[in-house]
Regions:
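GNAT-family acyltransferases
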Residues: 1-106, 127, 131, 173-174, ...
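Amphipathic alpha-helical recognition patches that constitute DNA-binding helices
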Residues: 12, 23, 98, 102, ...
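Conserved hydrophobic/aromatic "anchor" residues
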Residues: 16, 123-125, 157
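Amphipathic alpha-helical segments that line or abut small-molecule/effector binding pockets
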Residues: 22, 114-126
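Conserved beta-strand-loop-alpha-helix junction that forms the acyl-donor binding cleft
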Residues: 104, 108, 123-125, 138-149, ...
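Glycine-centered helix-boundary capping/hinge motifs
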Residues: 109-111, 129, 133, 156, ...
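Conserved active-site alpha-helix within GNAT-family acetyltransferase domains
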Residues: 110, 114-116, 143-161
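Conserved catalytic-core motifs of GNAT/GCN5-like acyltransferases
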Residues: 136-141, 153, 158-178, 190-191
Length: 193
C-alpha cells in the first residue's frame, strides 16, 4: 500500500524510499531513541536497505518519511528523512490501526512530530475517497517517555490501560501505556480548534 504524499507547513510526508536507508540506519543507532521506544531488535545494514526499498509496497501499513517542507524558489530545500511515522496493523473490518513515530535526535521537541501526527490522523479519519475512514487509531508509549505521552494526550489520545513492567530499561522496568483516539473524538477536537 503505497502511502500518499501528505504536505504540511513544517513537514512533508512521503513514502519511504531506498535512499532513506542511511538515515534509518542512523535512527537505529540512536541509544536514547531506542530506549524511549523500547526497541530491542537489531538489524544488519542489508536488512535496512532491503526494507527501505520494499516497505512502500507492503500490505496493511503505510510508512512515511518525515521530511522538511521548506521551499526555496518553488523547490524543496531538502528531501532528507528527519523522522518516520507509520500506520500499521491496519484492520479494514474493525477500521483500526496502530501509530508509531520516531524522530532523529536533532528534530525532537521542535513540532515536526506533532505536525506529522496531525497529518496522519487527518488521512486516517478522512471519510472521503482519499482517506482510510478509520474508527480508531491506537499506540503504545513507554512510561519512561512522559514527553511523548503528553504530546499524544494533547492531540486527543486517551489512555486506555497500562501493561506493567512490559519493557526493560537497563536494570529497571517500564510500563507500556496504551492510548487511542476514536473518530468522533478526533472530529470534535478538529471542530474545537
Amino acid at each position: 500500500m503505497t502511502p500518499p504524499v501528505l504536505p504540511g507547513e513544517m513537514v512533508r510526508l512521503r513514502p519511504i524510499q531506498a535512499p532513506d536507508a542511511e538515515r534509518l540506519w542512523e535512527s537505529l543507532h540512536d541509544p536514547e531513541g531506542m530506549r524511549l521506544t523500547g526497541t530491542t531488535a537489531s538489524f544488519t545494514r542489508q536488512q535496512i536497505d532491503d526494507w527501505a526499498a520494499t516497505v512502500a509496497d507492503r500490505d496493511g501499513r503505510f510508512d512515511w518519511a518525515i521530511t522538511p517542507a521548506a521551499m526555496r524558489d518553488g523547490e524543496l530545500v531538502s528531501d532528507d528523512l528527519i523522522g518516520e511515522i507509520v500506520l500499521n496493523d491496519i484492520d479494514p473490518v474493525s477500521r483500526s490501526a496502530n501509530l508509531r513515530l520516531q524522530m532523529l535526535p536533532d528534530y525532537r521537541g521542535r513540532g515536526y512530530g506533532r505536525e506529522a501526527i496531525e497529518q496522519v490522523l487527518r488521512f486516517a479519519f478522512d471519510d472521503g475517497p482519499d482517506g482510510l475512514r478509520l474508527h480508531r487509531v491506537g499506540l503504545d508509549v513507554l512510561s519512561i517517555n512522559p514527553r511523548a505521552k503528553a504530546l499524544y494526550a494533547s492531540l486527543g489520545f486517551v489512555e486506555e490501560g497500562r501493561l506493567r513492567d512490559a519493557y526493560r530499561d537497563g536494570d529497571d522496568w517500564s510500563d507500556a501505556i496504551v492510548m487511542s483516539i476514536l473518530e468522533d473524538e478526533y472530529r470534535a477536537m478538529v471542530r474545537g480548534s
